[in-house]
Amino acid sequence: VSIAPAFMTVATPLPAIAAAPLIELDRACVIRGQVRVLHDLSLRIAQGQHTALLGPNGCGKSSFIKLITRELYPLAHADGSVAVRVLGQNRWQVDRLRSQLGIVTGDLSSNLADMPGLTVEEAVLSGFFASFVVPAFREVTDNMRARVRETLALTGALPLLHRGYAELSAGETRRVLIARALVNRPQALLLDEPSTGLDLVARQHLIATMRTLAAQGITLVLVTHHIEEVIPEIERVVLLRGGRIAADGTRAELLRDGPLSDVFGGPIQVVEHEGRLTAFAG
């Protein structure tokens, strides 16, 4: 039985963009435990192509993120071809990868919160070293500290500079994580359900920050099940279901009642107000 919903015939996959590839997956398969969680996933995201990967819990979103960040590895192809490339490369040192592709995930937040006595400034500085603390043997320069203040100001979190990281609210944490992801001036940001746990005001601040970053030329790759996070600048939408791509097309084609109802397995109603989308179940 094919899991591909009927609306796939409606969606028109976007043509390849003549830009350097940000992410390339070629028949990527991932097994976690004894379960195959990604099935022959083929996907190309170009630099400058803001993209949202959308789907229900268990559709493979977290496995996709861990595949890109090299926390999971794909099965080897029998023909020796490469299954995953990021910025054109298939071999990365983790610290170099994360300096080019900023990462904002819930796992990262939890790891930082577990560091005793960590301040916001130290949390953001740790982004320079792809670690959860500032290594004792590494020098922190004045330029680094200035860049920390710059990115915190961009996300509206500069007043938090000397606060303890573990004391922050969910909204404050998200602003600090985005600032941390920006310290190395990455070409792109990978955002994992960034509005989870945020109140209405914090969510609106997050949306405004995302739009600012998109306008500055930072490519956004959003992984979520909240369509409210899909800002207008994100034109490409990839729907995931059961570890496979169910549809790949434009936001106008896919962020609608029918496609979302099919991929989420129940009736979904999409309402648009002043350019903002909201989804309701039932």
Predicted regions and their residues:
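H-loop/switch region of ABC-family ATPase nucleotide-binding domains
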Residues: 224-225
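Conserved catalytic motifs of ABC-family nucleotide-binding domains
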Residues: 185
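Catalytic Walker B motif of ABC-type/P-loop ATPase nucleotide-binding domains
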Residues: 189-193
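Conserved ABC ATPase signature
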Residues: 138, 164-168, 172
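Conserved ABC ATPase "signature" region
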Residues: 125, 139-160
